[in-house]
C-alpha cells in the first residue's frame, strides 16, 4: 500500500476480503448521515501472517485496506503515517467533456475512526532514508521500511511457532508435563 494514491471503493473492499474473513472492512457515511457498512464475506484467501508497508503516499482506497487490516488485527502496518484522505468521491462528466469530482461520503475504519486529514498511524513507525532510495532499491536491503517489515513478519512467525509448540493439544507437551509433574521440576530451557 506504500505510495498507493488510492482507487475505487469497491476494489478496496474486494482486496480487503482477500485477507479479512469476517469483520468490518469499512463504513461510509453520506452527507445525509446514512451509514453503510461493508464486511468480510467469509472467503479470505489466507490466514498467514501479514505486514503492510504504508507511508504519506498511501491514500484513499489504500487507507481503507490498511485500516481494515490494522483494526481487525489481521496484520501490522509498518512505515509512516498515511495521507489521510477519508473521502468517497464520484467523478461526473460535464457536457463539454470536462470532469467534476464530487465528495459523496466519508469513510470510517472498522473501529469507527475518521482518518480524513489525520491519516493512519502505523503499528511500527519507520522513517525512510535521508537520501531517497532508487526505484531499483525498493524492496531490497537498502529500503529501511522493507527491512523493518521483514523483521516484524519474522517476529510474528516466530511468536506463532512458539505458541503452537506449547499448545496444550500437543501430545509431546502433555507427555513432558506428566513426566515433570512427578519430579515437580519444570525446565524453562
Regions found by a protein language model. Give the residues of each.
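Short, well-structured beta-strand/strand-turn elements
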Residues: 57-59, 72-85
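Conserved functional hotspot residues or short segments at active or partner-binding sites
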Residues: 113-189
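Flexible glycine-/small-residue-rich
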Residues: 54, 104-106, 128
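Short acidic, Pro/Gly- and aromatic-enriched capping/linker segments at domain boundaries
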Residues: 96, 101-105
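Extracytoplasmic/secreted envelope proteins and their assembly/folding machinery
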Residues: 9-16, 47-50, 62-66, 70, ...
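Short catalytic/ligand-gating loop segments at beta-alpha or beta-beta junctions
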Residues: 32-33, 78-88, 166-167
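Gly/Ser/Thr-rich loop/hinge elements
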Residues: 5-60, 87-92, 108
Amino acid at each position: 500500500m506504500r505510495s498507493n494514491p488510492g482507487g475505487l471503493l469497491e476494489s478496496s473492499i474486494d482486496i480487503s476480503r482477500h485477507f479479512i474473513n469476517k469483520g468490518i472492512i469499512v463504513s461510509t457515511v453520506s452527507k445525509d448521515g446514512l451509514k453503510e457498512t461493508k464486511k468480510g464475506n467469509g472467503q479470505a484467501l489466507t490466514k498467514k501472517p501479514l505486514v503492510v508497508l504504508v507511508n504519506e503516499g498511501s491514500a484513499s482506497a489504500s487507507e481503507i485496506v490498511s485500516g481494515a487490516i490494522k483494526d481487525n488485527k489481521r496484520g501490522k502496518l509498518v512505515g509512516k503515517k498515511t495521507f489521510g484522505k477519508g473521502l468517497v468521491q464520484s467523478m461526473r462528466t460535464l457536457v463539454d467533456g470536462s470532469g467534476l469530482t464530487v465528495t459523496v461520503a466519508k469513510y470510517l475504519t472498522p473501529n469507527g475512526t475518521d482518518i480524513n486529514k489525520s491519516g493512519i498511524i502505523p503499528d511500527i513507525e519507520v522513517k525512510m532514508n535521508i537520501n531517497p532510495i532508487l526505484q531499483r532499491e525498493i524492496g531490497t536491503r537498502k529500503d529501511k521500511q522493507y527491512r523493518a517489515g521483514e523483521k516484524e513478519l519474522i517476529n510474528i512467525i516466530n511468536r506463532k511457532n512458539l505458541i503452537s509448540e506449547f499448545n496444550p493439544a500437543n501430545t509431546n507437551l502433555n507427555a513432558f508435563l506428566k513426566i515433570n509433574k512427578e519430579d515437580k521440576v519444570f525446565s524453562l530451557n
